[in-house]
């Protein structure tokens, strides 16, 4: 018996195989059966590559409820919403059950799942996944029994809950029968390769990748199937922020525009301050400053001041790559900004109007008003507490009278 350490660990290699498949084929709807602690789902939400619906199914609701919040959006998902939508759902259910919501998926993954079924249940598994669900592709991974003698200290199956472990021939026999009965083609591969002359035993984990043969049949749910009762129990559902949501898109666009405009405003203020106090700065620094300003003026419209307003040309803001990616055209950008009350623009819509001075006085007034309001709230709460104490004393006195 030979020691066979795997680096990275075998489970990570299995997940990476699925991630690589998703990167290559970009399925929009993915469902993972036997998702347990949601490890694969967590990885796929970071490597979504076009995934719009990510679903996990497991019979163990306790584990799902414990792990489901690890799939929630991060702060960064709100600060930088993705271009495409993403919904994640977790269900308590069995791969042996015909559930209407599992139809119409592009990819089904069954990572180290099938060996936990009884042998007589495998046919039902095949019928539900390949016959009823009929996804575009299915990835099935399972232990290779021929590799077991190379695993140190192993007696019997690799896990106490495994009902069987197939040799390569047994796995391939099952897979080819599935293809004949349900119209799929299959390719075999694996992860966890033995070293040296032991390679003839195959991979430690064997993998079958099924692709449905195109037959022109629409596999989406029919109207009758929409009426079928659901047998799964929805435990968790979250919709990630994305630019497909008009409100999120508008907020993101305005934030980017204002950030860029404030940046240009600040640059202009610094430059003006240095011009007004040129005797404090070295000639090389001033020369560099004027050279940069002239270059910008030649290439783009300059920022300018009108009274107490600094005008930042919209064309300057439009030159920001992030703004261009969000808006597509300068005209569309102008239209979006004119719709938003947070943005002040020139009469002809050619520039954003920003205050020349930081409005410190208004900030102080707002802080004073907030402090006064807080003090009033404290007084109100104190009065309520005093009244409660009086009522409590009165109530105690009434009990004493009895």
From Swiss-Prot:
Its cofactor is Mg(2+). Disruption phenotype: Defects in germ cell development due to reduced piRNAs levels. It comes from the Eukaryota. GO terms for cellular component: cytoplasm; nucleus; P granule. Binds 1 Mg(2+) ion per subunit. Signal peptide: none annotated. It catalyses: small RNA 3'-end nucleotide + S-adenosyl-L-methionine = small RNA 3'-end 2'-O-methylnucleotide + S-adenosyl-L-homocysteine + H(+). It is an enzyme of class 2 (transferase). Keywords: Cytoplasm, Differentiation, Magnesium, Metal-binding, Methyltransferase, Oogenesis, RNA-binding, RNA-mediated gene silencing, S-adenosyl-L-methionine, Transferase. Residues 356-374 have a biased composition (Acidic residues). Its EC number is 2.1.1.386. Gonad-specific. The keyword Metal-binding applies. The keyword Magnesium applies. It is found in: Cytoplasm. Methyltransferase that adds a 2'-O-methyl group at the 3'-end of piRNAs, a class of 24 to 30 nucleotide RNAs that are generated by a Dicer-independent mechanism and are primarily derived from transposons and other repeated sequence elements. This probably protects the 3'-end of piRNAs from uridylation and adenylation activities and subsequent degradation. Stabilization of piRNAs is essential for oocyte development. PANTHER family: HEN1, SMALL RNA 2'-O-METHYLTRANSFERASE. This is Small RNA 2'-O-methyltransferase. It comes from Danio rerio. The gene is henmt1.
């Amino acid at each position: 018996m030979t020691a066979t350490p795997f680096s990275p660990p075998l489970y990570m290699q299995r997940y990476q195989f699925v991630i690589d498949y998703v990167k290559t084929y970009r399925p929009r709807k993915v469902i993972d059966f036997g998702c347990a602690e949601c490890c694969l789902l967590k990885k796929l939400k970071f490597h979504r590559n076009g995934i719009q619906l990510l679903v996990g199914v497991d019979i163990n609701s306790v584990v799902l409820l414990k792990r489901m919040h690890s799939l929630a959006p991060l702060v960064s998902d709100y600060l930088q919403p993705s271009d495409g939508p993403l919904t994640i759902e977790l269900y308590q259910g069995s791969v042996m059950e015909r559930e209407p919501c599992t139809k119409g998926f592009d990819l089904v993954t069954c990572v180290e799942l099938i060996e936990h079924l009884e042998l007589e249940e495998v046919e039902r598994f095949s019928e539900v996944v390949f016959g009823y669900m009929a996804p575009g592709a299915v990835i099935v991974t399972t232990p290779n029994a021929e590799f077991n003698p190379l695993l140190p200290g192993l007696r019997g199956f690799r896990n106490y809950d495994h009902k069987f472990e197939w040799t390569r021939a047994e796995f391939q026999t099952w897979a080819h029968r599935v293809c004949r009965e349900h119209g799929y083609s299959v390719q075999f591969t694996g992860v966890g390769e033995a070293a040296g002359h032991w390679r003839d035993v195959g991979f430690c984990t064997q993998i079958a990748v099924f692709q449905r043969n195109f037959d022109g049949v629409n596999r989406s749910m029919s109207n009758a199937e929409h009426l079928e009762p659901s047998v799964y129990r929805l435990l968790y559902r979250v919709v990630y922020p994305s630019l497909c949501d008009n409100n999120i898109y508008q907020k993101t666009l305005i934030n980017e525009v204002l950030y860029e405009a404030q940046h240009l405003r600040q640059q202009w203020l610094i430059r003006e301050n240095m011009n007004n106090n040129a005797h404090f700065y070295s000639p090389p620094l001033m020369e560099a400053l004027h050279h940069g300003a002239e270059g910008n003026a030649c290439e783009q419209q300059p920022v300018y001041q009108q009274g107490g307003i600094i005008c930042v040309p919209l064309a300057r803001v439009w030159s920001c790559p992030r703004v261009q990616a969000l808006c597509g055209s300068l005209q569309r950008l102008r239209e979006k900004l004119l719709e938003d009350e947070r943005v002040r623009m020139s009469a002809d819509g050619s520039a954003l109007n920003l205050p020349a001075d930081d409005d410190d006085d208004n900030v102080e007034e707002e802080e004073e008003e907030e402090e006064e309001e807080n003090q009033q709230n404290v007084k109100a709460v104190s009065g309520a507490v005093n009244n409660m104490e009086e009522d409590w004393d009165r109530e105690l006195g009434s009990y004493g009278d009895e």
